[in-house]
From Swiss-Prot:
It is found in: Plastid, Chloroplast. NCBIfam families: rpsG_bact (TIGR01029). Belongs to the universal ribosomal protein uS7 family. GO terms for cellular component: chloroplast; small ribosomal subunit. Keywords: Chloroplast, Plastid, Ribonucleoprotein, Ribosomal protein, RNA-binding, rRNA-binding. This is Small ribosomal subunit protein uS7c. The keyword Plastid applies. HAMAP family: Ribosomal_uS7_B. One of the primary rRNA binding proteins, it binds directly to 16S rRNA where it nucleates assembly of the head domain of the 30S subunit. One of its GO terms (biological process) is translation.
């Protein structure tokens, strides 16, 4: 048994312009090689493009996209008796949001296009509408969990 206490859960800080935690989570996830100012630039340009495309609040589009992509359940590999099973597990809200952001960035990097801001804005708008690769990834994860429902007792 560990003598150390449990780690306190850190609350995500909000970004300077929109004062939103989701934007900050997105910035920290898009960050490469410590270039945070470039990450902020990319996110803010993407949000500006969303504003121009949809003529609505870009934060509501971002929130809608993340809620649409957030999975309720995922599969985890668990070794039982010499064979590995994909065991479905429920996901908490924080972990679900983190997965959703990761999938949105993965899908936007895969997209053809001029720059990351353009690709990210397109993916966010598509995800808010209920289409796009990130939504497909969520549905695929849910299908995997449904297919392996028989192994749920291995939790």
């Amino acid at each position: 048994m560990s003598r150390r206490g449990t780690a306190e859960e850190k609350t995500a800080k909000s970004d300077p312009i929109y004062r939103n935690r989701l934007v900050n989570m997105l910035v920290n996830r898009i960050l490469k090689h410590g270039k945070k100012s470039l990450a902020y630039q990319i996110i803010y340009r993407a949000l500006k493009k969303i504003q121009q495309k949809t003529e609505t609040n870009p934060l509501s589009v971002l929130r809608q996209a993340i809620c649409g992509v957030t999975p309720d359940i995922a599969v985890k590999a668990r070794r039982v008796g010499g064979s590995t099973h994909q065991v479905p597990i429920e996901i908490g809200s924080t972990q679900g949001k983190a997965l959703a952001i990761r999938w949105l960035l993965w899908a936007s990097r895969k997209r053809p296009g001029r720059n990351m801001a353009f690709k990210l804005s397109s993916e966010l708008v598509d995800a808010a509408k209920g289409s796009g690769d990130a939504i497909r990834k969520k549905e695929e994860t849910h299908r995997m969990a449904e297919a392996n429902r028989a192994f749920a007792h291995f939790r």
